[in-house]
Amino acid sequence: MEFSDVSTPRMPEAAEEKLRVLSMIAGRFESAGIRWALGASAMLYFRGLSDSFHDLDLMVAMEDAPAARDILRPLGTLLPDNRTAQYRTKYFYEFTIDGVDVDLIGGFAIVKDGVVHDCSFRPDSVDGSVCVCGRVVPLQSLAVWRGYYERMGRTARVRQIDSASR
């Protein structure tokens, strides 16, 4: 696995806060033995494929989702359930932690053409990591997220990943 320190003094203040929150969560998840990885736009950011990210998408093993939720609950505000019909995710929790939007996702499932695709987190979907403020943050693979984005109809993200793979 690769490690790189992504915290730089030139990052905007809002990005620094996201990194601080991510580092804090990573430490707590590590201490509790939560199986997880960072996905979506933040994962693309750490791989150098995006200049920014809006929130933190934490993909967790389905069995660990309730414990992960309990770890995050005292750190911030749990928002009301806001699921859409495109997803049939078993555990989906949105938090605001120190002003940072954090999505906790366990048993991820995407509905496409009436078919539910099980996209649950698996530890073998992790193919790298980064060091954020002294904490190791596992990253889900680009290949896994390319498949997710394709099922979601996010063609711009698919092209972005494809162009990086060339």
Feature-to-residue mapping (PLM):
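Active-site nucleotide-donor binding segment shared across nucleotidyl transfer reactions
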Residues: 25-56, 60-63, 67, 141
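Residue-level marker for the onset of beta-strands and adjacent loop->beta junctions
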Residues: 25, 32, 89-91, 126
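Short amphipathic alpha-helical segments and helix-helix/interface helices
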Residues: 22-26, 69, 92
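Short amphipathic alpha-helices in soluble, non-transmembrane regions
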Residues: 68-75
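Conserved catalytic core of two-metal-ion nucleotidyltransferases
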Residues: 78-112
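Anion (oxyanion) recognition and catalysis
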Residues: 30, 73, 131
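Catalytic cores of NTP-dependent nucleotidyl/adenyl transfer enzymes across multiple folds
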Residues: 112-166
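Helical scaffold of the NTase/Pol beta-like nucleotidyltransferase catalytic core
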Residues: 1-37
